[in-house]
């Protein structure tokens, strides 16, 4: 069944973190935005997620007007601690990220976007085709569950529809896939006492080589505990998912205290999480969030990258929507900036995800971090995605790796 054609400045496919951020920020700049979401329920949320937000996203969260809502909802600010077999714990008490379930975050952000003047939320519509004009994207065809097809014409189409992006498939923008040799099981728990660092609950990450685990504290006393296994253990773990998950979590060094805790949700598996990197833009078309770059979830970077890439796209292109040549130049700038900001982190995380033994330089850095706060801070800046992984090759940091220093000694 054919339907109508509607013109917008921007058509955003995917009303999750990246898509809602794009829609609200474009509309605040005066654009008319179609926000297209295949799930009909406005309260829908992503289930398999680490639920951690990096501190680099805080300026975007504040700009959206979301920070106050998160604070009112009781979402904690988080520090971070890391454990490795090469020296034990090192911490980052000044990290100041956010710990929020997608059950809370997604509906809050979607409501915020939908209430923004200039945004038309289209729940229950799926992208089924691209509208093209010579050499560029010019909109999307969408279909609802009754089979009605609607043509949404737009000066800019934004794929914000995740790792397996339908927009990328329809536009034939293929991703570069790097192997991921680990798989994940997540579950929510209530009653796991948070470990505090400088007064904030800490995200805790265990890099066990080759296994891994994480404890992500969230609002309402909920914690997400993640167990990470190398792919060669897939058959064994799937034969006893609950037992394998709990044995790994309970055996962690200084692990979560489960004495008074109960699991409040089912164990959710993510067995295939390929590292996908695709071109961030083409004429009339851009990708944000996981649709542009999907990487190892162990490090909890995905939500932060979604916020940041969405804001970056709007800031580069909002003033150029009325002129195709200016828009394409802005999209090229977005692509260059995206690559410089995110690709080094993607390459570092995807290299770790192949589950090879941690190399001697990484071992040395992790060992030094337990006794040298400068090294710990440098690693923390990389883990928090505040600085490029090249930070660890800074001669001042390299010197501290080569020559051990005690706390209090001069650099």
Q: What is the predicted role of each segment?
A:
Residues 8-35:
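N-terminal Rossmann-like FAD-binding beta1-loop-alpha1 element of flavoenzymes
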Residues 6-7, 59, 76, 81-170, ...:
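Conserved N-terminal helical subregion
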Residues 315-411:
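C-terminal helical "tail/cap" subdomain of flavin- and related membrane-associated enzymes
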Residues 27-49:
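Glycine-rich FAD pyrophosphate-binding loop
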Residues 160-255:
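Conserved FAD-binding catalytic core of PHBH/FMO-like flavoproteins
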Residues 46-80:
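N-terminal FAD cofactor-binding segment of flavoenzymes
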Residues 1-7, 290:
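A short, basic/flexible loop-to-alpha-helix module at the beginning of a structural domain
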Residues 233-316, 320-322, 326:
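FAD/FMN-dependent oxidoreductases across multiple families
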